[in-house]
Amino acid sequence: MEVNILGVIATALFIIIPTSFLLILYVKTASQEQEQ
């Protein structure tokens, strides 16, 4: 089975970008709660 490099990269970005975005939002809200 031949692996499509562009397909793998697109899938990785499709998973990593939303996940990192949610992590950043979570860290921001968590740090704000600790400050209060």
From Swiss-Prot:
Compartments where found: Plastid, Chloroplast thylakoid membrane
Record SUPFAM superfamilies: Photosystem II reaction center protein M, PsbM
Gene Ontology BP annotations: photosynthesis, light reaction
Transmembrane segments: 5-25
Membrane topology: Single-pass membrane protein
Keyword Thylakoid part of the UniProt annotation: yes
Sorted UniProt keywords: Chloroplast, Membrane, Photosynthesis, Photosystem II, Plastid, Reaction center, Thylakoid, Transmembrane, Transmembrane helix
InterPro entries: PSII_PsbM, PSII_PsbM_sf
Single GO cellular component term: chloroplast thylakoid membrane
Main location: plastid
Superkingdom assignment: Eukaryota
Role summary: One of the components of the core complex of photosystem II (PSII). PSII is a light-driven water:plastoquinone oxidoreductase that uses light energy to abstract electrons from H(2)O, generating O(2) and a proton gradient subsequently used for ATP formation. It consists of a core antenna complex that captures photons, and an electron transfer chain that converts photonic excitation into a charge separation. This subunit is found at the monomer-monomer interface.
Subunit structure: PSII is composed of 1 copy each of membrane proteins PsbA, PsbB, PsbC, PsbD, PsbE, PsbF, PsbH, PsbI, PsbJ, PsbK, PsbL, PsbM, PsbT, PsbX, PsbY, PsbZ, Psb30/Ycf12, at least 3 peripheral proteins of the oxygen-evolving complex and a large number of cofactors. It forms dimeric complexes.
Similarity field: Belongs to the PsbM family.
NCBIfam families: PS_II_psbM
Full protein name: Photosystem II reaction center protein M
Source organism per UniProt: Chlorella vulgaris
